[in-house]
Amino acid sequence: MKRTSTTLTIASGKGGVGKSVVAVNLAETLTRRGHSVALLDADVGQGACSVLLNEDPPHTVADLVRLDAAPDAVCHETTAGVTLIQSARAPDAFVTEQQATVLHLSLDEMLRTAQHHHDFVLIDTPAGTGGTVRWALDRADLGALVLVGEPTAIADAYRLAKLIWRTDPTFPLGSIVNFAETAEEAKSIAARFATITERFVHQAPTHLGWIPFMKAVRTSVQTQTPAVRSVPAVQEAFDALAGVVAEGRHHERQPINTP
């Protein structure tokens, strides 16, 4: 029997906002709450999820493209029980339009496999508005835009939000504020961003949650151990975020842009 799966795409307008850290910690938190979770790292050649988890998947989606591995072999179970799917290791893989199309077809195959066996599939995208980002958002039931308070990051996030809503005005987009000192600061950043999007595209993302700015999070990146395993304040933040995501599960969306 097919599971009722929810696909959440985690995106950002620019790099350096902690998107992959959010994806990894949220995946482990949902798993700890009893959900089966797959984490698809769609950042071709520059994916950080395996590094942050200190895992070394033997196969990637690129191996599936080359017929060197079956879909089940590409699914790697981490020590925390998350199914990790890595797109490709080589940064110069799938750079042409034709190669990207082939990759997206294989990503679709892996996504269907993950959706069939898991309650949640989290897709960690590259930063920006490229083709793989659009592919991942188009396949999602819900999008989560990672925000930080820097003006350039807000501007880049706005460009991505504008692209999303001009493509699909009904797309369910939420925001996660990262690197915030307090809940009040996080709410202020989310509200400021919502004011911008409401003014120019007449839409506003739902504020899903926030992650505190802590030295322990930076340390967890260096030690390749997700902070939710040992830092209570981070555990609390991600547990609240996971609760919002789990309670707000959306019905299946139909893709409207097939590359």
What are these regions (language model features)?
Residues 1-5:
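Phosphate-binding P-loop
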Residues 6-71, 120-122:
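Walker A/P-loop NTP-binding active-site region of P-loop NTPases
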Residues 120-209:
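Conserved catalytic-core segment of NTP-binding enzymes
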Residues 199-227:
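Beta-strand-loop-alpha "switch" segments that mediate conformational coupling across diverse proteins
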